[in-house]
């Protein structure tokens, strides 16, 4: 072995022995002078406090702190002078270990280097007057001029609870420190510290009325801190810590020298879950933001700035960035979304840091909702007490994508495109009380669609739906159904108020124009709305299902008001011109307020209603006929469901009024034997052509007269209709071939019983008599043949001579009528 190495080893051994001897001497000194050492340590600790420090006993610890000497202080209690008032010990610890410098101990002036507290609580308390138990640390007046000898190099806490409670400023911080080790390095400016900690943050309330940040979060960190004594600034550079399982960067400043003291905390987290990010905020803020969720991790930055003063709520700014994520909202999930966002609890400067003045701003938002792509340049959510959302939404999509949203129960789109540009301001969820306002338009082009409840199909259609506040206007509508092209515009006032709350009050006003309409293309409106099963490839979300169900409810309950102007109208064999109609449709009722049309050289006017019952639809109408060609009129309406007299038998112009009730099939055909009511008519320039009942009279009389073409000079009466019966009051008919007096009942099935009185007098003899009463009286003079029309065995009406009993009954009936007329 080299000589120099032997010398080195001997020297090291001697130094080690001296160190051990010195350490043993120090330990022996402590054992021998416990009371004196305890007094000196207590005195050193008391240098910077104004209060009471109580130590039950002191014991030396042999190996702890080697090569220094450590002592254990048992049951240490530190109290301020007003402890009897507030009852909060500043420090209460079962074990406090102090590492003492050996040389200072041997000199009789022990200097504390390290402090370790195990199993205790630190409670920093400030009452409502502003008094704090930390006043115990106010330095006593220095009479020696010497600086304090207490400079701790290391502080260690194990299983210590730390509470900071400020009653006057409504602040409460609570932490359970499993372990904290702080190594301090003193310099001319103050000190630097390296802190390692494992701590559970139970509460971090900057305002106890607002709730806690990072509540019940475990913090694992290796932190570097710097304290500048002159400015009383504690600086925490931005560095990584762990909050539960999330890695975040934490930095900040605590400015204790300012009045009041202030602080800034900065937090950054990359790839953190949205729920984890929310959990770092106060429950109130978290609850407001939890109306949405983000499936994949995102990048978050948060800044908290506040003052340690009465009821101060710190300024909170949270920024985040989302890329290709899924955003869940009250209206359903938004997929493939990317955006930048910021939360700010002071939207308007000087209005305070509170929910009402808080807001969320989202930039460059893009995503897909129910497969509809859309963009929002800037989206605002303000007043988190009662949230208001505002933003301009733009989208271009194929109309077929709407089928999934509306459920395929009302409308089904087969082709076409839509361009959406809407500015929305209002509540976020249906329960919100804020009124919603929408401005902008939706343009629809080249649309093919079906309206299933009415079995209607439209092709190559277009429209512009314009939103103005709470109202909706539908403009430039072109609907092509079959051979019919409709041009429409409409309005739906107060749409946003009534859509969910009271759809029965909704009225959709339509103005409809068309050159020609074939009503067969719209026959589906006659029947009741059909219940259609939803056609969905996939089941949509609950919010979309509710929207679809509500759309069907609105379509069922709302009122549609139509104002129509049509150049030409066709309906089976009916043809008319210049249709003007005012029609209302509500639930299962079609109300014809005022309908007029030119038809067969005259004019028709109708009002009434149709009750949609499905296969059979009941109607009640009042109609007026002015100067209509009677043959065309009967032909157009399929002889009104009867065969007593048909269009082929009639000529002339008719003036009539009708008040009838009946039933139509869902195809618009008259249901036989369902017509009830009355018709008053006046036939001018009339003719009966090949009318079989008249021709049958010729078998009895007037065989030489032309009964195939009978011109009617005057024909006016009222007919009462009762199902399959037409009741004919007494009616005098003047014609070119004969005069007739008719009354009775004509039955469409069985029960025909018509009295026919035929005077043999030639009508031409009375042509020069202008007075109608005189002409009728003279026409019935002379021989009168009394006939009767009854049911034949073959089902047809037959004409026969009246029996003696029939004649007597008719004479009595006539006498009674004359007596009634002569009565005063």
What are these regions (language model features)?
Residues 105-109, 310-314, 350-354, 430-435, ...:
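Short loop/turn motifs that connect adjacent beta-strands in outer-membrane beta-barrel proteins
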Residues 135-143, 525-553, 824:
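Intrinsically disordered, low-complexity segments enriched in small/polar residues
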Residues 68-90, 113-129, 152-164, 171-183, ...:
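Small-residue helix/turn framework positions
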